[in-house]
Amino acid sequence: MEENSNKFEQELKEIGQDRNQFPHISVEESLQEFDSFSNKIENESKQFGAQKDPESYMAGGETEEDFKLRKYFENSERMHLENGGNEKKMGVSIRNLTVVGLGADASVIADMSTPFFSILNFFKPSFWTKKTSTFDILHDVTTFCKDGEMVLVLGRPGAGCSTLLRVIANQTASYVSVKGDVRYGGIPSKEFERYRAESIYTPEEDSHHPTLTVRETLDFALKCKTPGNRLPDETKRSFREKVFNLLLSMFGIVHQADTIVGNEYVRGLSGGERKRLTITEAMVSSASITCWDCSTRGLDAASAFDYAKSIRIMSDTLHKTTIASFYQASDSIYNVFDKVCVLEKGRCIYFGPVGMAKQYFMSLGFDCEPRKSTPDFLTGVTNPQERIIKKGFEGRTPETSADFEAAWKNSDIYRDQLQEQKEYEELIERTQPKVAFVQEVKDENSKTNFKKSQYTTSFITQVVALTKRNFQLILNDKFGLFTKYLSVLIQAFVYSSVFYNMASDINGLFTRGGAILSAVIFNAFLSVGEMSMTFIGRRVLQKHKSYALYRPSALHIAQVVNDIPFTLLQVFLFSIIAYFMFGLEYDGGKFFIFSFTLVGASLACTALFRCFGYLCPSMYIAQNISNVFIIFMLTYSGYTVPIPKMHPWFSWFRHINIFTYAFKAIMANEFEGKEFNCLESAIPYGPAYQGSEFDAYRICPLGGIEQGSLYFKGEFYMDKTLRFKEGEMSQNVIIVYCWWIFFVICNMLAMEYIDHTSGGYTHKVYKKGKAPKMNDVEEEKQQNAIVANATNNMKDTLHMDGGIFTWQNIRYTVKVPGGERLLLNNIEGWIKPGQMTALMGSSGAGKTTLLDVLAKRKTLGVVEGDSHLNGRELEIDFERITGYVEQMDVHNPGLTVREALRFSAKLRQEPEVSLEEKFKYVEHVLEMMEMKHLGDALIGTLETGVGISVEERKRLTIGVELVAKPQILFLDEPTSGLDAQSSYNIIKFIRKLADAGMPLVCTIHQPSSVLFEHFDRILLLAKGGKTVYFGDIGEKSKTLTSYFERHGVRPCTESENPAEYILEATGAGVHGKSDVNWPETWKQSPELADISRELAALKEQGAQQYKIRSDGPAREFSQSTWYQTKEVYKRLNLIWWRDPYYTYGSFVQSALCGLIIGFTFWNLQGSSSDMNQRIFFIFEALMLGILLIFVVMPQLISQREYFKRDFASKFYSWFPFAISIVVVELPFIVISGTIFFFCSFWTAGLDKTSDSEQTFYFWFIFVIFLFFCVSFGQAVAAVCINMFFAMTLIPLLIVFLFLFSGVMTPPSSIPTFWRGWVYHLNPCRYFMEGIVTNILKTVDVKCSYEDMITFTFPKSYNTCQNYTSAFQSYGPSGYVESSILNGEPACSYCIYKNGEQYYKTLGWSDDNRWRNVGIIICFFVFNILMVILFVYLTRKGSR
């Protein structure tokens, strides 16, 4: 064994490690739990080794007890090398690195005035000479990391830690410029771009598909990263299973393998478990260089240490180069690393061995407090409020980042590191590790993959894996899938009933065209929903792209593969019902062509709308573009505007229109060879003309047909009326599929080369003129002075009136498949003024769940037990008077930081407090949170990369609660994701709140010793939601530690962190174990009995000490409903103003559609065909209104999520939000409607037949109709739980709107069932009646020669009047006049005499115009009531 030990030490030295730097780490002890898994691996190794040399794989024949995780990795690496593999030893060397970013004033918050100022600035000479503002994110940084080494990067927010990691990971696209020399094992950074998968960056936020399980998430990643050079006899499946089980065991998520991941809106893994999944997924990539950015966020201290040890072992054994940035690192984690790089304001102020860093800064004159961790000390020296200067060094220590950098570059350690870096680079030059690296990368590639590919697996393998994952995503949403196909079935029956069993006469001729076009439109509307799906999962795609898991184009191919079976089913369900109920030709071949064409059209439309999504940065831009295209495609399909009526400036569009080719193909399929008759409708008609002798003198009212032809073929109608060429059916079907392929290729290219995500990089934008100077020395001094002043004045501004809050026998049960699960088990405790209680436990112990229960945030499950405030039952105002800092940072992105804080203060502080005082307190909180310089910065979103960072969002979350001056404060991991200094400020601030009289409880994962000392009491939970300890912490934690020492735990040393000590003692962490059943021990302890007695005493004390309120009953909300409504409206109006994509998008859409429709129906005349064109003009305007529904739904759904968060904290009620989000749209709707009106009304020539009253009426009813459409979309969105469900439901509802409007099917032709109620309940019907009668009532029809139906008459009648007198006595519309045909006397019939005749055939009257306006307004009001109702019903989120 001694020989083995010596060999082990020798291996460590070869790797370049000095284990003496961290003697307290016991790898053997930390890896006991891997024994069972290791035994399995050992057996596999022995079986393989039996064929070769068994002793070489077992590291000298260690016993089973010695075979730990380290040995597993060592054996795996050894086996790999002996089978011809190569080592990937890729260190990183950086010299004189300067990274330049955009200055804070380079861009300002965009709003509706931005386009105007941009246009004005374009003509200013200064615009062309002004230089873009920039600043140095990193300045002249020189550092390196050898293969197998670990470097810890420390720094406060804004120091440049994340930027350094991104540059090392070769992700530099977000920066203005990157100067300096970066080499990877001797390979320049430019050349290393081809090995993207070998240097990865893992950002601090977690990006996953929330509906996938842990198993599905990791199995997919493994399928994409399964190497080609596996061990002999090792299949792809066995490799994946081995690595999957290993990683789940390493990070303690074995039991969560089949749990969905979840996110802030979907229940799933806890925050800590989700973080472990992020780490695990990154490790699957098997990169040579890994950069971890705050990867311990959300992990408890024990789990964070386990994670650090795991990457230590992998770095040692697999020669991984590891660079990590931790905001809060304990000494245990710190000592795992080899070197540390300390940054401040973009400058390197120390780089060298971890063991020398503390001494270096102490030599500069700084002192370290007892029990303060080294990482906290290293970052704290840069903060004037935290650093301690030794006596005798006053005025001699560095003050600014430039001073620290100068001191560093004058030090001996700096010169030593430069020398070591030079020697390392010389070693690289001699050994040329890149040769083995390049060969290994080639060998890892799949045999079916290109050798120079950046990806491990082939394109086909990627597509197969993505296809399976996409199927899982679809099938995991069973409710959405069910509702989609239910909607398809309902729509099929609705369409079929309207066009049921169409006759083979001339009336059936026209309705067949409408039915076929409706079938094409139906599939298009369903496809629109796919566009919004392209915006979901963009961050996941960006992450996977950076990991080189798959080509983005492979994702689209997989989506297309997924589309095919679901589209086939969708079209089959529709076709099997619609085709035969329509009464189309009962022919199997024709049914197949009908369905096959619809499938192609649906796939092509899906690809087209996805293309808009991929090309556009905003969903609203994409939706507006798609709406314009739908109007264009519908107008030029060949049905609403026949080809002879198309003007040359737009007629070209029919050649690139999917609808045109699909419509022509299905029309040809149905009409070719089919015979129609016009026996009943031939002119003249009536009993007097029924004899066979009159057949030769009657004519079908169909252009181009010969007199006497009462039967005709469908080809004749297609040729003469529609101008569709014969024999083009097959060609048109092929073209439809060609368009599909074309858009698929476009989408592949768009996904490969267009990336609208930021890759985790956030760029701040400020109000105009409010941007601070970046990394400026003077600005730095001013900021330090502000924080110092705020700290000194804290006590003067904090006045709290807290109470005693108790809870007893709290149990929380949720339903799970197969039964129920108890998450909290008889928890009891209290918080009272002046005390600060810590809530601790391992990840998944139930800390967040307990806070949710105590704060009355739970809406699901069963809560049992008693909670009392001041000895009394909780009242209706409890949520308002308590602050709850949640783990997830949910903020409205359209506000600035200061606006968000002021909004909270205005609505949650008592109404008696003046606005001036509220705003003054907001400024104080901004200063204390070190966010004064961010006050005018836009919050933004991480997806777009515009806004504040993850860490700044956490501080804002805390600030939003603090400005409300709550009486009780619950904080769920308030320091998670914050740096040590920010954490210290937060805890110190909270301590001040407690000292001022606020009771509070705070969950905390990784408290340093300094932070932990601020707490008075602790509630420690074990997994299963059971109490381990509740009581005082005591001076220097003696009371707490003595409890555990009394039950057999080793004593806690003076230098040890008590928080880490108790987590270790209770078996927390990934693989933590304890021989003591701590929950049972607590039940038997005398402390529990004391707790029970004190609880009873506190209830009585609270009831006596705190009088019943004298200001009347408790108020749920602080402010009146009117005040809430005013403030909510102002906020929403500001958000709309700052979203030009949304507001101007609707304006541009209205302008384009107005111009397209206006120029399509250019300068309409008085002929009968022009009157039909007037009807279709109005129908297109109606479709524009309907398409606006798609635009407004995402806005309400997204804003509702922010409302739920605000409502939970009782900012405002449901009514102010519901009414405000409707009213805020109205002015923008008026502008949109007016733009459309001006672009189309005069262009189409409608002014020639309209007086001023008719013109005003047209504008007014159109705007009112837009009010209805927008509010209808909002009402539907309010009903739906998510965007997918909304996009599934809305096509079904739109069918009723346009199908029963009286245009697609005349009212007399609508089936009695629908005509009896749906027709009369359809707002579009009243819109069409009002606007059609308004336009046509003054139109006198004078048929053109082409529109006249001319026919001869028997000579015995002498004159046309004699022949048609009987016909005219029947009261037909239109007029008859004498004419000449081929030199013979004839009659010419014009189908309409005036517009009134047309709309009277529909049962409409111009007397109902203003009545119809009133009815539409009633529908608008009804929609508002529906929005209010469903906002009320869904006001509480599911949690």
UniProtKB/Swiss-Prot annotation:
Chain intervals for the UniProt region annotation (Disordered): 1-21
UniProt-listed InterPro entries: AAA+_ATPase (IPR003593), ABC2_TM (IPR013525), ABC_trans_N (IPR029481), ABC_transporter-like_ATP-bd (IPR003439), ABCG_dom (IPR043926), ABCG_PDR_1 (IPR034001), ABCG_PDR_2 (IPR034003), P-loop_NTPase (IPR027417)
Residues annotated as signal peptide: none
Record's bilayer topology term: Multi-pass membrane protein
GO MF, one annotated term: ATPase-coupled transmembrane transporter activity
Keyword Disulfide bond among UniProt keywords: no
Gene Ontology biological-process annotations: aggregation involved in sorocarp development; sorocarp morphogenesis
Binding sites annotated in the UniProt record for ATP: G841, S842, S843, G844, A845, G846, K847, T848
Biased composition (Basic and acidic residues): 1-17
Domain called ABC transmembrane type-2: residue spans: 475-700, 1141-1366
GO cellular-component term (any): membrane
Compartments, record wording: Membrane
Segments traversing the membrane: 479-499, 516-536, 564-584, 589-609, 614-634, 734-754, 1144-1164, 1175-1195, 1217-1237, 1256-1276, 1283-1303, 1413-1433
Residue ranges annotated for the ABC transporter domain, each copy included: 117-370, 805-1049
Keywords: ATP-binding, Membrane, Nucleotide-binding, Repeat, Transmembrane, Transmembrane helix, Transport
The family this protein is said to belong to: Belongs to the ABC transporter superfamily. ABCG family. PDR (TC 3.A.1.205) subfamily.
Protein name: ABC transporter G family member 14
Native organism: Dictyostelium discoideum (Social amoeba)
